[in-house]
């Protein structure tokens, strides 16, 4: 793959060149931070990947809005861990003004809620921005298109509880796992 990089640490001329190469299809992939041009209007972006947790839904929505501007199918992928949340919370806790700190925490909580959705993501985003999706199923987000498998885990839970009780709760999880596995 032909890829370029774009971040605030690059010299201005290198950033400009990376952006031009991407716009002119000389580079297929651009790996960028949020420093990447807000005004990028490339209609055929097919994939936007967030490798870390965004700070706000506003920022996330603006960034994913770069995908599929030509109306063709595109994908957005968001990877996150709870470590991302803790990192953002560390910086939020550095904010001295309580009102600003509370607002930043609320925005972070909204992003986390979005990440943990099991219902339509598009509906959630549109509602957040004061719009409405008439259907509960957009037929395009992962929550709406996922084939969900369920199973009754009550037997497994009973065996785990039985193993804990039979060992008088004196052992750690690794020992209990060994007992269960035989």
Predicted region positions:
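C-terminal helicase lobe
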Residues: 1-36, 40-182
């Amino acid at each position: 793959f032909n890829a370029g990089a774009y971040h605030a640490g690059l010299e201005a001329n290198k950033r400009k060149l990376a952006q031009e190469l991407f716009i002119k299809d000389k580079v297929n992939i651009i790996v960028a931070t949020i420093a990447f041009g807000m005004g990028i209007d490339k209609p055929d972006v097919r994939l936007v990947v967030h490798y870390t947790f965004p700070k706000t839904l506003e920022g996330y929505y603006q960034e994913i809005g770069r995908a599929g501007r030509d109306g063709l199918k595109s994908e957005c992928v968001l990877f996150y861990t709870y470590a991302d949340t803790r990192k953002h919370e560390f910086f939020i806790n550095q904010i001295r003004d309580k009102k600003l700190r509370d607002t930043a925490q609320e925005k972070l909580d909204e992003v986390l809620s979005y990440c943990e959705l099991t219902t339509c993501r598009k509906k959630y985003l549109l509602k957040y921005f004061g719009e409405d999706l008439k259907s509960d199923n957009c037929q395009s987000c992962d929550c709406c298109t996922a084939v969900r498998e369920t199973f009754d885990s009550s037997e497994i839970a009973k065996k785990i509880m039985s193993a804990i009780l039979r060992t008088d709760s004196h052992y750690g999880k690794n020992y209990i796992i060994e007992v269960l596995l035989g």
